[in-house]
Each structure stands twice: as C-alpha cells, then as structure tokens.
A protein has these predicted regions:
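Catalytic-core regions of core metabolic enzymes
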Residues: 1, 9-162
Length: 162
C-alpha cells in the first residue's frame, strides 16, 4: 500500500533509545585511510587483509607497511608509519604479540587514532601474556588510542566498505 509506506516512520531517522558512546569510533569503523602493518603479497594475514579491502571496495587510502617491499597489489608500500605522507586514521597490526605494544606506541606517535590488532599470546596464555595485555590496555587508556584487540580476527563495516 503506497499510502502506508508514505506514512510509516523511517527507522533511520528515529531517535535511538540506546545511549550514544562517549568514544568517537569513526577511526575504527569509518576510517578514511588504513595502514596495514605487516602487509605482504605472499599470503598470510597481511595479504588477506589487503585483498579483502580490495574485494569489499574500500575507497579510502590504503598504506601497506613493510620495509621489504616498494609496492603490494598496486599500492605503494611504506617502511613505517613515520614514512606515510599523512597519518592514517586506522592501522591494522598483523604482527606477533611482542610487536603489538611497540606498534601501538608508534601508531600513537604517528597520529593514528585507531588500531586493530591481530595477534595471539595474551591473557589466554597465562601470566606473561596477561601482563602484556594489561600493558596494552593501560597504554591505550592513557593515550586515548582506540584499540580493537588483541587476538581479534577483524571486523567489517559493510555499509561503508571498510
């Protein structure tokens, strides 16, 4: 019925009963640029993430980070976050657990606002891993760096193709 469709409320414009988060999560979920730390053309997580971004149709700027390559899948590759022409909104850290905290510190220093970490070996492994995870938590809390992880297989915002 045409008349019913015209007068039914549009759910997208209604005020949500859910409280808004005090955190601005756009750098994680709608980034204009993404750095992929540990990018590689040779398989593994760094290759899969880049290919998934291409398949999804991500239209933002992609910065593969790996000092071993000049280009990966048509994207110019950079040695580190410090070498980027502009800070990335988000960084995906696809390295081992011992590299995660130093990369979070580098990301924060480079102006990155959000980081996704794909590494295991934290609280799920016991004492030392739990202590590493606590240091990551403390750093992100103190610095204001948004962090999804550790040990996160990733996420996708299908609407915005990120």
């Amino acid at each position: 019925n045409q008349n019913a469709a015209r007068h039914s409320p549009d759910r997208r414009t209604k005020e949500s009963p859910v409280k808004k988060s005090p955190w601005k999560l756009d750098p994680l979920f709608t980034p204009r640029s993404i750095a992929v730390i540990g990018a590689s053309p040779n398989g593994g997580a760094g290759s899969i993430v880049l290919r998934n971004m291409q398949r999804l149709g991500y239209t933002g700027t992609v910065y593969p980070i790996n000092p071993q390559y000049k280009e990966i899948f048509g994207y110019p590759c950079y040695a580190s976050l410090r070498d980027l022409p502009a800070p990335a909104d988000c960084a995906a850290v696809l390295l081992g657990s011992r590299s995660l905290l130093p990369m979070l510190e580098e990301a924060h220093a480079a102006g990155v606002k959000g980081v996704w970490g794909f590494a295991s070996g934290f609280a799920e492994t016991g004492g030392e891993g739990r202590a590493m995870q606590r240091r990551i938590h403390d750093f992100c809390h103190e610095s204001g760096l948004l962090f999804c992880g550790p040990n996160c297989v990733g996420y996708a915002n299908i609407t915005d193709k990120t």
